[in-house]
Amino acid sequence: MAEKTYPMTKAEKEQLEKELEELKLVRRPEVVERIKIARSYGDLSENSEYDAAKDEQAFVEGQISTLETQIRFAEIIDSDAVAKDEVAIGKTVVVQEVGTTDKDTYHIVGSAGADIFSGKISNESPIAQALIGKKKGDIADIVSPATTYQVEIISVEKTK
């Protein structure tokens, strides 16, 4: 069975590698030290510090595993290889809802780099799926669970 690939820009992959390094070199040793200290308190059956540290260790190890997989199966997307005005991973797109003055700016990223609060949307999201491949001036149909609406692509630029 073929492994899933994770489309991303080179910059996104580098960011994941930094996060992985931080987890391995800083967070993991901190958690191990917390476990060691909590063990020194004695009885582990009623030791909430120990339980919390073990839970954090499981979380950190899960993050490490996820990042290692995403990095190992990264598919680097070169946004320069796509037409300058075409929406793709690594591009920033400004859209305006048809019939309104509402504008939104999205940075199209691979799923590993998605952060809606920073305007970074995954290439797998419904909005990105509707926009990818379109060009400035095109109309895209956005289908969300609540509604369907149209947006016009106002501008497309390489994300800085």
Swiss-Prot record:
GO terms for molecular function: DNA binding; RNA polymerase binding. The keyword Disulfide bond does not apply. InterPro entries: GreA/GreB_C_sf (IPR036953), TF_GreA/GreB_CS (IPR018151), Tscrpt_elong_fac_GreA (IPR006359), Tscrpt_elong_fac_GreA/B (IPR028624), Tscrpt_elong_fac_GreA/B_C (IPR001437), Tscrpt_elong_fac_GreA/B_fam (IPR023459), Tscrpt_elong_fac_GreA/B_N (IPR022691), Tscrpt_elong_fac_GreA/B_N_sf (IPR036805). Gene3D superfamilies: Transcription elongation factor, GreA/GreB, C-terminal domain (3.10.50.30), Transcription elongation factor, GreA/GreB, N-terminal domain (1.10.287.180). Keywords: Coiled coil, DNA-binding, Transcription, Transcription regulation. One of its GO terms (biological process) is regulation of DNA-templated transcription elongation. The keyword Coiled coil applies. It comes from the Bacteria. Residues 1-71 form a coiled coil. HAMAP family: GreA_GreB. Belongs to the GreA/GreB family. Necessary for efficient RNA polymerase transcription elongation past template-encoded arresting sites. The arresting sites in DNA have the property of trapping a certain fraction of elongating RNA polymerases that pass through, resulting in locked ternary complexes. Cleavage of the nascent transcript by cleavage factors such as GreA or GreB allows the resumption of elongation from the new 3'terminus. GreA releases sequences of 2 to 3 nucleotides. This is Transcription elongation factor GreA.
